[in-house]
Amino acid sequence: MVHMAEDKQDVGGAESTPPSILAKAFLVIGAFNERDRVLTLTQISRKTGLPKSTVHRLLQRLGELDVIEEHGAGYRLGIRLLQLVSSMPVDGMREVALPHLAQLQAWSKESVHFGVLRGNEVVVLQALFAVDHARPIGEVGTRIPAHLSAMGRAMMAYLREDELTELLSGPLVGITPKSITDPARIHEELKQVRVSGVAVQKDGVVLGLGNIAAPVLIKGRPMGAVAVQFDSSKQVSESVINAVKLTAHRICSDTTQMLAQGRGDLFPFDD
């Protein structure tokens, strides 16, 4: 599902062309996350790979725009970003999903996630972590190849055939020795998802960890997916499977109700 290496927000190929000023600015913004809310110039330079002089100039300009602000001896994201984020359509999905994710996390005592499909990747929109996790895995904004993710497969199972063909046509990267990258095997697993209503992955992203996910379907289309993390050495209980499916169903019901109330602008998916 949603597991990442140290200080990485994307899993995939590296950019081959030199980054533009805009790209560098986004690198600086992307250095911040739920774990690193305040960073020094040196920390930002180390995380982005940019020279300190470049980071300093970018921080000055972003500060003038209220995108970044000083905080003690470091920096944090500014109020302008909050204003922009609050106007994003995906924020409506997070609003609907959050109370149901909270119930699922409180019941399961495991980390839970809600993600959406963007191209050939899953993007984590909401994450609630188990209290005993020393390091959160799968923070908000994390991206992972859809074919490796339980959430990704849960949504892929309900794509149109042409969409699925396009998604699987490119190079399918693996992260661990147990990552599934064979298109034929992925197709077979997607058939099972349509029968069972859930997708399961074990050890495909991080050895020792697995996830079970259920899609949130609106008008037959995958709007998002809910996932629960578990120890891959253990079997997933029927109660967990049912809880994940019920959570996805509740998010679907609330979303359908909001659409009926004319709030379709919050949910950017096809009719």
Where in this protein do the model-derived segments appear?
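Short, solvent-exposed recognition segments
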Residues: 6-8, 133-205, 271
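Sensor-regulatory modules in signal-transduction proteins
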Residues: 216-218
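Amphipathic alpha-helical effector-binding/dimerization core
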Residues: 76-170
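Short loop/turn motifs at secondary-structure junctions and domain boundaries
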Residues: 106-107, 203-208
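Short amphipathic alpha-helical signal-transduction/dimerization elements
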Residues: 33, 152, 156, 160, ...
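N-terminal helix-turn-helix
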Residues: 2-94, 252-253, 257
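Juxtadomain coupling helices with adjacent low-complexity linkers
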Residues: 196, 207, 223-271
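Short hydrophobic beta-strand micro-motif common in sensory/regulatory domains
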Residues: 210-214
